[in-house]
C-alpha cells in the first residue's frame, strides 16, 4: 500500500461496504434473537404446564394441545413424572421437579445468550452510527469540492 492518502470517494466506498457488512450482521443477530425469544416462550410454557400438572389430581380429565389450536381430551395418569427433550431428538422420563429444574436451567442459558447477542447488536449499531457520521462528513467535504451528488441515504 502506498503512503498517499485515499480520495474521499474511495474512503466513502470502503465505509459503505463496512456499513453494509455490519447491517447484514445486525439483521442476522435480530433473526437469532427472534428464534431465542420463541425458544424462551416455549420453555416458559413448559415450566408453567409442569407446575399446573403438579397441582392436578391423577385421573383428572384435561385438554391436551395437539397443534394448530386443536386439543384432545385426556386423563392424567401421573402428575409426578414427565417426558422431556434432552436434545438430539432424544426424550427421557424425569420426575416433574427435576424436569422443571432442567427447563429453568435452559431458560437461564437462553436469557444469557439473548443478553450477549443484545450487547453485540448494540456494539454493531454504535459502529454503524460511527460509519454513518463519517459518511456524512465525507459527503459534506465532497459537496464543498463540488464533485458529488451525495451518497448517504
From Swiss-Prot:
Membrane-spanning parts: none
SUPFAM superfamilies: Prefoldin
Keywords: Chaperone, Cytoplasm
CDD domains (alphabetical): Prefoldin_alpha_GimC
Entry GO terms, CC: cytoplasm; prefoldin complex
GO biological process entries: protein folding
Molecular functions per Gene Ontology: unfolded protein binding
Cell compartment(s), UniProt: Cytoplasm
Record's keyword annotation contains Cytoplasm: yes
Pfam families given in the database record: Prefoldin
Record-stated family: Belongs to the prefoldin subunit alpha family.
Primary role: Molecular chaperone capable of stabilizing a range of proteins. Seems to fulfill an ATP-independent, HSP70-like function in archaeal de novo protein folding.
Subunit structure: Heterohexamer of two alpha and four beta subunits.
Protein name in UniProt: Prefoldin subunit alpha
Organism: Methanothrix thermoacetophila (strain DSM 6194 / JCM 14653 / NBRC 101360 / PT)
